[in-house]
């Protein structure tokens, strides 16, 4: 217990184990997909003993889930610390959803009309859009055409307009969004160290006095997280004081990324917590690039672009 002894393998055993391993790995009734290459399986020497080393690379999202047998719901496992644990059906379905290169957020929701979109949100968004793009030809379009240009709406099977998933999330009302995403929930809290006080301020998507969509949530929360960022008095551009610093942009980008990369089919929602000078943002779903690509930067793969 708590130790092991290297017994080693003979050359004959190594050849047999390699043959058995590759035979099993390439049998689609036993393993769904072989993602290993020859260099992943090789004999090495430990001390004076020969052993067979097998390196298992992380599967690309296009290949996940890799599972044992023929049923992904019963044969998909995840390595966690010292053990292999059966993945939940929810996690397996999320892997299948992430295989697509065409973003799922452009899927047309045939069962809805554009009346499920919040007109105040659309109006507010168009005002900001026009301020940022004053000469843009889309500013002259009617709302329906504008939404189609944004890919927030598209023609359904009957030839009429319906929102896309992106359009519903971005412009819809929360009670319509939860018809498609039952666990959709956006939550922002301002907390303090006083345990007797649950929070100093809170807003969430189910309050009912605002839309609860991700655009309005972003607008509400960005003003709250920006407020406490100190701006040096000497922060000027072309002789005029500028009330923004790089930290503002970083915080807003973090919030936008949490909304853009979230798996809204997941079991939990998005939680943003501000406590003094600390800010934590959590969302459902894993990143779709490798850890090395994430730290290297330059390779974005958003779930909901």
Language model segments and positions:
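Conserved N-terminal catalytic/coupling substructures associated with nucleotide/phosphate chemistry
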Residues: 1-247, 255-305
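Conserved N-box helix within the HATPase_c
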Residues: 250
């Amino acid at each position: 217990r708590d130790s092991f002894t290297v017994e080693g393998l003979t050359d004959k055993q190594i050849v047999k184990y390699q043959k058995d391993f590759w035979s099993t790995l390439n049998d689609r009734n036993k393993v769904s997909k072989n993602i290993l290459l020859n260099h992943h399986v090789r004999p090495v020497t430990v001390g004076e003993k020969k052993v067979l080393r097998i390196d298992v690379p992380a599967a690309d999202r296009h290949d996940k889930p890799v599972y044992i047998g023929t049923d992904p719901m019963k044969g998909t496992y995840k390595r966690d610390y010292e053990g292999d644990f059966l993945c939940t059906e929810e996690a397996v379905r999320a892997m299948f959803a992430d295989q697509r290169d065409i973003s799922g957020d452009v899927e047309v929701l045939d069962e809805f009309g554009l009346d499920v979109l919040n007109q105040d949100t659309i109006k507010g968004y168009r005002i900001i859009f026009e301020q940022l793009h004053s000469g843009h030809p889309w500013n002259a379009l009617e709302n329906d055409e504008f939404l189609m240009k944004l890919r927030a709406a598209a023609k359904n099977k009957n030839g009429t307009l319906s929102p896309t998933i992106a359009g519903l999330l971005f412009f819809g009302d929360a009670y319509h969004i939860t018809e498609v995403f039952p666990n959709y929930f956006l939550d922002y809290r301002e907390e303090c160290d006083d345990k007797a006080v649950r929070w100093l301020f809170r807003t969430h998507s189910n309050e009912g006095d605002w839309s609860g969509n991700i655009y309005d949530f972003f607008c509400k929360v960005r003003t709250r997280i920006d407020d406490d960022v100190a701006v040096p008095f000497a922060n000027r551009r072309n002789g005029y004081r500028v009330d923004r610093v790089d930290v503002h942009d970083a915080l807003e980008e973090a919030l936008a990324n949490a909304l853009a990369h979230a798996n809204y089919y997941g079991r939990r929602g998005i939680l943003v917590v501000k406590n003094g000078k600390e800010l934590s943002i959590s969302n459902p779903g894993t990143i779709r690039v490798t850890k090395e690509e994430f730290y290297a930067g330059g390779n974005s793969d958003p779930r909901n672009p």
